[in-house]
Amino acid sequence: MTVSENSVLETEVLVGGSAMPNERPGAMEPQNLSKMPEGFPRRSTVANGVRSRASRRFLVVGGALLLSLFAIYEMGAVFSIGGITPLEYLVLALFAVNFCWIALAFCSGIAGFLILLRKPRAKDLQVTELHTRTAILMPTYNESPDRVFSAVSVMAETLSQTGHGHAFDWFILSDTTDPDIALLEEQAFLVLRQETHKHSRVYYRRRRKNVARKAGNVADFCRRWGSRYDHLLVLDADSLMESSTITGLAQRMQADPDAGLIQTIPSLINGTTLMARLQQFAARIYGPVIGTGLGWWVQKEGNFWGHNAIIRTEAFMTAAGLPNLKGKPPFGGHIMSHDFVEAALIRRAGWSVVIAYDLPGSYEECPPSIIDLAVRDRRWCQGNLQHSRILPTKGLHWVSRLHLLTGIMAYLSSPFWLMLILTGLMLALQAHFIRPEYFTDQFSLFPTWPIMDSDRALRLFYITMGVLFGPKIFGVLLLLKDGEFARSVGGRIKAIFSVIFEVILSALIAPIMMFIHCGAVMSILMGRDSGWSPQRRDDGSMPWMTLIYRHRWHMLAGVMLGYAAILDSLTLLAWMSPALIGLWIAVPISAWTGSVKIGEVFKRAGILATPEERNPAQICLQAQDARAAYQKHIAEPWTLAQVLKDPALMELHLAMVDKQPLRAAGTPIEAMEAIVHVKVHEARCQQSALAVLNRQEMAMVLANPLMLRSLQKLPEQFVEEDLVSFC
């Protein structure tokens, strides 16, 4: 396909001007983690602008500590009747760690439940005129261009209709390494420019080297263009945001000169598989309870989840530059889970970090299958465990350290739960197979009886289950109380049925995820790096043999644990069955939950429905229509051969190549770049050059105007007569 064959691309001039605006370089230096930088923390502009209420911390964190101390005391009392053995001490220690983890979530849930009972409304700032400039950033890495560019198209158009569009510029920041996807991005950008250039300023840049992944992508933008803008609104490749939410974030940031970062709580949408629908439903019913409670008590010491948030550019560039950690990955090198760290550093510098739990209209998508969730969690697990290197950073607020610690525990809790199960099983087997030593070596007139307080143990079990499922219960109570909310998910009866189904299916999946997280932690401790692979976002299906291979150890672990339990008694096996059944049938669970067809069956039945699915926001419907249109626009992908052949297409491509200077003369040349230079130089024609270039090398050529010009000068094909005439 040539340029002239596409009505959208009838000109060699890039519609709307340059692919990127003129640079305005600014400094974003890596922060020193071993000492507090000079001038930090800054003085707040408004009196008490970054001060939080201690009473809220006391109620939630203090309540969690008191609840944990009570539970630990009760567990100790269960064992103390006959004297506590070393194995029982281990059970007590593991129980203490795990209970503290769920107690904090429970107390946050209580706070969120009480707030949501009052149905708080978002602060209305619609009348505020925006005099600040915001760059809306959409980083992408080997994603489907139709998804990314159609979302930007719809959001830009709806934002332009608010009267505030002049205050925003849009940037698609590509780190794509696949040459085919890179060319599709350029095709999609041309369509996007054609649609939006009259009402919005939309830009595109693909980095030559994706150093430091997403954090490096955003940092590169800040150093080159960040000084042009007051704020950065960071999205993800699957993000959508209503125009009222975008303007609301900018207005809140403008109204609060001490705000460094404002994070929304995104709703999950567009789930097509059963697994995605399960996550959507749980996040919609129970998520607001935890999110609202968290935002209420952390106050000005909130967190950043990497996207769907607005950041003050000054705060980000002066305080959140990420250093490289000493050593090699997985614990050294670039900071992977950058978001938590950036929020902590911004707060350290004296800016507030707020979770806007009252602001709706923020959306994202979720992994479609257990395997896709495992791939994502492997990367997140490495990043969160890496935070153990960040915890000692000088000057961090204790709540920021708590965010880092809870992120670490999100994955370490699985090994702790597994160890608790194993030690409890060992206690049962010990009591069954090992004869008690009633009289020890120490002189005593009375024997040592291996007994436990069974009534207290059962009571503690019920308390633990109440704490564990408390946030779910709070979410269900809010659902039942709010008739409008209940109707939006299909009515109270279907909602209750969906809750029961979600609890059962989640209970089956939980032990699988526990072993997945245990495996991730183990591989990280063994020094294995996760790498960076693009995410699947739609169909989660996989061949059965692949699933058997991926879940083989989970099934084996379930069989071994079941065998150990039955050695003691059928009663113990029955008690452990909720955790074992999921492991035994891990493969069919993984297959069924990753199926779009099964997801569609549940959608038609109205099970696991959410308000966003039954009555989607207008922007979600527009995004679906726009994506279908973009798929048609780029149905005939460009190729590098076409770019070299068509001069007009070449000029359009070069107009979208990053203008960052190439390697300066005299500086060392990287191995791959040298190899590409040799291949291009030795090629007799374009066809032979393309035949010897691999995909990574093609991506490099696409980003290098000099190499492209060299290839363009070559004949399209090599003809023997050319060699004769040359001789």
UniProtKB/Swiss-Prot annotation:
Record's signal peptide: none
GO biological process, one term: glucan biosynthetic process
Pathway assignment: Glycan metabolism; osmoregulated periplasmic glucan (OPG) biosynthesis
Topology class, membrane: Multi-pass membrane protein
Entry coiled-coil feature ranges: none
Domain of life: Bacteria
Keywords: Cell inner membrane, Cell membrane, Glycosyltransferase, Membrane, Transferase, Transmembrane, Transmembrane helix
Top enzyme category: transferase
GO cellular component: plasma membrane
Ranges where the record places region Disordered: 18-38
NCBIfam families: PRK05454.1-3, PRK05454.2-1, PRK05454.2-5
Protein's UniProt name: Glucans biosynthesis glucosyltransferase H
Organism: Shewanella baltica (strain OS223)
